[in-house]
Amino acid sequence: MALNLQDKQAIVAEVNEAAKGALSAVIADSRGVTVEKMTELRKSAREAGVTMRVVRNTLLRRAVEGTDYECLKDTFVGPTLIAFSNEHPGEAARLFKEFAKANDKFEIKGAAFEGKIQDVEFLATLPTYEEAIARLMGTMKEAAAGKLARTFAALRDKLQEAA
């Protein structure tokens, strides 16, 4: 189905808006993946706050101009599926990585975060906000407990010297 100029402009504008509001982007090739599997991926993406779209490469190049994802232009070869993470930078990467494990034909081409091409593994392992807070609290709690133990040990040693 051929797209007229207005349709193309609408697609470019839509993808550009998604790119401007996104925290990260991941590019993949979904050739050979069944429609049923792609429907499952789209459903998972919606639930995770990820915007996914298959876009023609020429339209995608125009859509990402002037955004942080312009660095991905070299990966726009062949059928291109782009996913933008809206709530957490690693969400799209994590989603695509899990999907690629289950589907051999699904190939992740690249990812970008803060205007730079990043490794998908790096993005997928970024902690969520809640995980980061939990790690910080655990570290603080551990440090406080260790300091308290050292204080009691010093007090015990001081009392033993005095006796």
Swiss-Prot record:
Transmembrane annotation, as ranges: none
Gene Ontology, cellular component aspect: large ribosomal subunit
Domain of life: Bacteria
Pfam families from the UniProt entry: Ribosomal_L10
Signal peptide residue numbers: none
Keyword NADP attached: no
Annotated GO MF terms: large ribosomal subunit rRNA binding; structural constituent of ribosome
Annotated keywords: Ribonucleoprotein, Ribosomal protein, RNA-binding, rRNA-binding
One GO term (biological process): translation
Similarity-based family: Belongs to the universal ribosomal protein uL10 family.
PANTHER family referenced in this protein's UniProt entry, alphabetically: 39S RIBOSOMAL PROTEIN L10, MITOCHONDRIAL
Quaternary structure note: Part of the ribosomal stalk of the 50S ribosomal subunit. The N-terminus interacts with L11 and the large rRNA to form the base of the stalk. The C-terminus forms an elongated spine to which L12 dimers bind in a sequential fashion forming a multimeric L10(L12)X complex.
Function recorded in the entry: Forms part of the ribosomal stalk, playing a central role in the interaction of the ribosome with GTP-bound translation factors.
The protein's name in its UniProt record: Large ribosomal subunit protein uL10
Lineage: Bacteria, Pseudomonadati, Pseudomonadota, Gammaproteobacteria, Pasteurellales
